[in-house]
Amino acid sequence: EWEKNSLKPWISKHPERESEFKTRTAGIKVGRLYTPLDLAGSYTDKLGFPGAFPYTRGIYATMYRGRLWTIRQYAGYGTPRETNQLFSKLLSWGQTGLSLAFDLPSQCGYDSDHTLAEGEVGRVGVAINTLRDMEEVFAGIPLEKISTSMTINATAPIMLAMYIAIGEKQGTNISRLNGTVQNDILKEVVARNAWMLELEPSMKLAVDIIEYCTRHMPNFNHISITDYHFREAGADSVRAAAFMFADAIEYIRWTLKRGLSVDDFASQVSFFLGSYMDI
């Protein structure tokens, strides 16, 4: 009835700009209007309810009405002191978590005075060479009360160990530490190239983190598997998602071989997605 009485008369006088509308990146066709009829007979299968399979409407029953998502800006200035000052300001402005950016030498395992680090020190994040550097980054910040995300992969075991040491120095039981370490070395090898060891020892270190956090830091996301970097490297949304899930399967296989049950560690596996305009 709407098409007959409203749409058709209007289009006869005011044609649409395009004969067909598609999403900007993946070219998915977008309909003119969507109604409950589009889900007729499959509402619970495709949409469902919050906190219930297939989780289209969220993994928690109340979602943001119960608790807002953590608000944190990916940030890291050249020196630890500058980064600490930035973090303190962000927290005073109402930010509810921290997201630490490392410079490329720190990501690839080079000290700041290494010849290969020349020109890159402190450029895309903070330079971390020692535990003292990391202590300066988090000076005056109680780790027990804040969630920290660290976008670090090849040197993730080192940076996470430093973070744990700071928590212990603050008198925090490490089981109460909360945050995320990216620890996704496969996407580094395939799409980004910030890796330092061959694949097998790199995977061993990644699973070392998964196992350690599972056993000692149950609130910490021990891996954040990402499709974003595949998109930036040229993959479309379908292939990027495929790479991401292929990586996830491989991490799970390696962790199962370590002797852990999937129910032990899977709840702290997180994902990082680049949705572009197709969301």
Which residue stretches match the model-derived regions?
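Generic beta-strand/beta-sheet core signal
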Residues: 33, 72-74, 100-103, 149-153, ...
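Acidic/polar, glycine-rich intrinsically disordered N-terminal extensions of enzymes
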Residues: 1-132, 137-144, 169-172
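Short glycine/proline-enriched loop/turn "hinge" motifs that connect secondary-structure elements
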Residues: 60-64, 214-217, 262-264
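Gly/Pro-rich turn-and-neighbor structural signature
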Residues: 2-31, 36-42, 158-160, 169, ...
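Active-site cavity-forming subdomains of large catalytic enzyme subunits
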Residues: 95, 117-256
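Flexible loop/turn segments at secondary-structure boundaries
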Residues: 40, 77-82, 98-99, 104-111, ...
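Glycine-rich, often proline-containing surface loops adjacent to acidic residues and nearby aromatics
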Residues: 65-71, 144-145, 229, 267-273
